[in-house]
Amino acid sequence: MAPKAVLVGPPGAGKSTIGRRLAQALDLPLFDTDVAVEEEAGRTIAEIFVQEGEPAFRALEEEIVRKAIESHEGIVSLGGGSILSERTRELLKGHTVIYLEISVAEGLKRTGTNTARPLLAGGDPRQKYTELMRKRRPLYRQVASIRIRTDGRSPARVVQQLVAKLAE
């Protein structure tokens, strides 16, 4: 068993929204790893970060991603930082991985000052998002077999393009 596609990208790129719509368009189930992490922990991601720290969160996330990649047959939406794990990047090899690309400006517009996103909380949001992208963009590109920009595009348009690409 393997997922039809795995979505990756930074906060605000549309992984959850596009994931839901893509799964619906393809009549497949969606597995959102952020939702699964929260269900497994019984807490929000922000609470895990505060109470246990990022390393504990990443360990739990890595295990949930592994299970999803190994057993889910639909669409898998990964948390934005999941690609920081070398183990996760290895697991993604050979799978259809869709990188939802977004500019820093658009990402900031979409995420705003969302405190549910612990890595963007506090300080200068533009600086934090820019630094996050500097570190992660090469990793997203490394794992991606399909790249699609989501800036200025409706979710419906992005899904339409992805359905066509997945049919190729």
UniProtKB/Swiss-Prot annotation:
Pathway: Metabolic intermediate biosynthesis; chorismate biosynthesis; chorismate from D-erythrose 4-phosphate and phosphoenolpyruvate: step 5/7. GO terms for cellular component: cytosol. SUPFAM superfamilies: P-loop containing nucleoside triphosphate hydrolases. Its cofactor is Mg(2+). Binds 1 Mg(2+) ion per subunit. InterPro entries: P-loop_NTPase, Shikimate/glucono_kinase, Shikimate_kinase/TSH1, Shikimate_kinase_CS. GO terms for molecular function: ATP binding; magnesium ion binding; shikimate kinase activity. Mg(2+) binds at S16. ATP binds at G12, A13, G14, K15, S16, T17, R117, R153. It comes from the Bacteria. It comes from Rhodococcus jostii (strain RHA1). Monomer. HAMAP family: Shikimate_kinase. CDD domains: SK (cd00464). GO terms for biological process: amino acid biosynthetic process; aromatic amino acid family biosynthetic process; chorismate biosynthetic process. Its EC number is 2.7.1.71. Catalyzes the specific phosphorylation of the 3-hydroxyl group of shikimic acid using ATP as a cosubstrate. It is found in: Cytoplasm. It catalyses: shikimate + ATP = 3-phosphoshikimate + ADP + H(+). Keywords: Amino-acid biosynthesis, Aromatic amino acid biosynthesis, ATP-binding, Cytoplasm, Kinase, Magnesium, Metal-binding, Nucleotide-binding, Transferase. Substrate binds at D34, R58, G80, R136. Coiled coil: none annotated. It holds the Pfam family SKI. Belongs to the shikimate kinase family. This is Shikimate kinase.
